[in-house]
């Protein structure tokens, strides 16, 4: 079976948008999130309205693109007249309400961040937001809808940049590379140093390391204290 040309693939990615246009919805926002699984950092969502007639041939599911490709696509999205909103929920709120509810909060904030209220939402996943806006949940929507794919790229680029900034503040965890996910280096740093202020304390990987990290810190202080004492005599 031959591969579809780029034009055909682009048309496929506009199926849900065109369906919404036929129903009378002019402003269709794609919504996606990133950062549900990491042990550290916020969950970030983006809402993107791609103007009718705009083509973004390089845009695809953010997970299938390299970091450089995502950055390039993000610049294209931001420079082609797309309306973009970003929502962010911090680790303390994730711990308070759970990651699913925090994801919904981030999505709602992203919609609120759009310059013009959308008429219809296309949401990645089988979700429905508590908003009085027509909406459709699309499982694996970032591979099926141009608007959702654009949102996935914007959210991913925004969060990756945030985690690189956090790396400058908390370098021992390697956030510039792992972006908060539970890599071997990250878990080792958690065991050695315990969690930092942007860790999600309700997540199992962080909870499991808390005692070890605190014990290591206490042991280090005890050892340093002994070294600093003067012998009696």
From Swiss-Prot:
Any matching Pfam family: RNase_HII
Residue positions binding a divalent metal cation: 32-33, 124
Family matches, as InterPro entries: RNase_HII (IPR022898), RNase_HII/HIII (IPR001352), RNase_HII/HIII_dom (IPR024567), RNaseH-like_sf (IPR012337), RNaseH_sf (IPR036397)
Chief place of localization: cytoplasm
ATP-binding found in the keyword field: no
Keyword terms, alphabetized: Cytoplasm, Endonuclease, Hydrolase, Manganese, Metal-binding, Nuclease
Catalytic activity: Endonucleolytic cleavage to 5'-phosphomonoester
Family annotation (NCBIfam families): PRK00015.1-1, PRK00015.1-3
Protein name: Ribonuclease HII
Organism: Syntrophobacter fumaroxidans (strain DSM 10017 / MPOB)
Organism ancestry: Bacteria, Pseudomonadati, Thermodesulfobacteriota, Syntrophobacteria, Syntrophobacterales
